[in-house]
Every structure is written in C-alpha cells, then in structure tokens.
Amino acid sequence: MIPGEIIAAAGDIELNGGLPTITIEVSNSGDRPVQVGSHYHFAETNPGLIFDRDAARGRRLDIPAGTAVRFEPGQTRQVTLIPLSGKREVFGFRQQVMGKL
C-alpha cells in the first residue's frame, strides 16, 4: 500500500438506495446559468427555474453529495428528487420554510 492510497472494495456503491423518488421537468427561463447543489432544498431554488415547486417541497436532487446540476439559459431537463432526511426542518435558503416541513 502506498501512503494515502485508497483501495475501494469490489462492487457497486448504491447512493440513496430505497428512497422514494420523483422526476420533474425543470426549465431555466433566465438569461444566466443556474447551478443547484446536491443538498439544496429544491423547491427554494432560483425563481428563474420553472417547475412544480409544490411537488419539490421537502426534496433535494438525487445526485452524489458535493455535486451539482447546472441549468443553462433556455434549457429544459428532467431531474430526479429524493426526500430531505433527518429532522426534516429547513432553515435559510430563500427563507420560504424556516422550520418543519
């Protein structure tokens, strides 16, 4: 083994396994790119993103931690969302919840 080397176990790693998912269509109506991080409360994203915000309430992107999805101006794409976990309390972001979901 080399110092600092990481030897991963064989097989696949399942991320967010067993969590209920929904897929929604999102359009960027703005003139600037919008990037949304993995743990951002999706319902509170940039108002220039057009999608069903009620369906997205209490959910985040189903992507690896620390990554993001970028929406270019005029772009429409589908994203998969999973429920926020833990205490299911949301504070900050765009201050639209500020408490329990």
Swiss-Prot record:
A single GO BP annotation from the record?
urea catabolic process
Q: Which domain of life is it from?
A: Bacteria
Q: What is its EC number?
A: 3.5.1.5
Q: How does it assemble?
A: Heterotrimer of UreA (gamma), UreB (beta) and UreC (alpha) subunits. Three heterotrimers associate to form the active enzyme.
Subcellular locations according to the entry: Cytoplasm
Any GO CC annotation of this UniProt entry: urease complex
Reaction catalysis annotation: urea + 2 H2O + H(+) = hydrogencarbonate + 2 NH4(+)
Q: Which family does it belong to?
A: Belongs to the urease beta subunit family.
**Can you name this protein?**
Urease subunit beta
Q: Which Pfam families match?
A: Urease_beta
